[in-house]
């Protein structure tokens, strides 16, 4: 009897041990499987994140990097002319497309109107300037030349006053009123009681063409007093910035010249003028880029429309408008069109 009980007890013990071992094995299996699956998921997440990071980095590099592989030599680079405000742009193009060691001081530039004359007379292949004036379009017509005008960078036509002037904003109607002679005192537009001295530029200058087409449009621009007609953009800035003589003055130019370019010429004088906001919008790179600044315009590539796709002018124009060309323009401080 005792032996039977002993054997029964041993059997029960064995069964319990087997059950425990099986339970431990099953538990261990599920634990290991769970840990393994979790590890796989973690690795997958890490790999996915790494892939995304690499993609983002590559995309940033694509935006920032500019190829500097030479595409021309100085001898075969097309003949180019430019206005004063676009010469830094054309210099940047030639440095990138030919090579950084180009001595741009030796390039043969004139200015806006002479540049148009040279293009119409087939003395240059391409010009980078403001839009053509009525006189320049008429000259081209007389010579049997049709001009093709292509925006290359965005630009803003700006008005500026002495930094001590209390007026910060004007409306488009007020600007027209000042330059038509209907508004003659700053108190009429929220300023001090002093006569307005509006400077102008000569006919066929880039600034004057912009003033007529962008600002005055169908409204007649008043004839300027002799002392208010100034031959260069720099001279107007000098006059307006003067504490004694410029407090009541207003002038106009293009955003790039009035900011980036002139600050490089004389930072102290540039600090004595301020740009006027138009219809509540101040001119800056952002408002010019998105078009919210009312007098947003462009600088243009101008070529002979008869030039074919393989011509030096059209090949260079296409390169200036390419991703590489637009990045060159942006790095030079201009607002790209693309």
Go through each PLM region and give its residues.
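N-terminal Lys/Arg-rich, disordered targeting/topogenic segments
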Residues: 1-11
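Exported/periplasmic ABC-transporter solute-binding proteins
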Residues: 9-139, 145-155, 161-338
């Amino acid at each position: 009897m005792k032996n039977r009980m002993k054997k029964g007890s041993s059997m029960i013990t064995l069964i319990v041990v087997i059950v425990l071992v099986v339970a431990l094995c099953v538990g261990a299996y599920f634990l290991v499987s769970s840990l393994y699956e979790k590890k796989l998921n973690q690795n997958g997440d890490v790999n996915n994140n790494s892939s995304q990071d690499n993609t983002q980095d590559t995309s940033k590099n694509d935006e920032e990097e500019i190829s500097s592989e030479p595409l021309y030599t100085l001898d075969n680079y097309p003949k180019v002319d430019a206005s004063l405000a676009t010469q830094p742009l054309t210099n940047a193009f030639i440095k990138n497309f030919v090579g950084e060691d180009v001595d741009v001081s030796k390039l043969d530039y004139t200015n806006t109107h002479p540049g148009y004359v040279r293009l119409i007379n087939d003395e240059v292949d391409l010009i980078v300037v403001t839009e053509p004036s009525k006189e320049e379009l008429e000259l081209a017509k007389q010579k049997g030349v049709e001009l093709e005008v292509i925006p290359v960078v965005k630009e803003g036509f700006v008005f500026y006053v002495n930094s001590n002037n209390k007026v910060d904003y004007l409306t488009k109607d007020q600007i027209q009123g000042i330059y038509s002679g209907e508004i003659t005192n700053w108190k009429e537009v929220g300023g001090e009681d002093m006569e307005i001295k509006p400077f102008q530029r000569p006919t066929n200058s880039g600034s004057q063409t912009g003033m007529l087409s962008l600002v005055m449009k169908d409204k007649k621009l008043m004839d300027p007093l002799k002392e208010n007609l100034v031959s260069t953009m720099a001279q107007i800035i000098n006059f307006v910035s003067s504490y004694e003589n410029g407090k009541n003055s207003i002038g106009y130019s293009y955003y790039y010249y009035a900011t980036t370019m002139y600050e490089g010429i004389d930072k102290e004088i540039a600090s004595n003028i301020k740009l006027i906001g138009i219809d509540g919008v101040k001119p800056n790179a952002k408002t010019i880029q998105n078009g919210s600044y009312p007098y947003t315009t462009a600088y243009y590539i101008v070529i002979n429309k008869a030039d074919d796709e393989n011509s030096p002018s059209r090949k260079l124009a296409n390169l200036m408008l390419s991703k590489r060309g637009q990045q060159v323009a942006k790095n030079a401080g201009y607002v790209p069109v693309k």
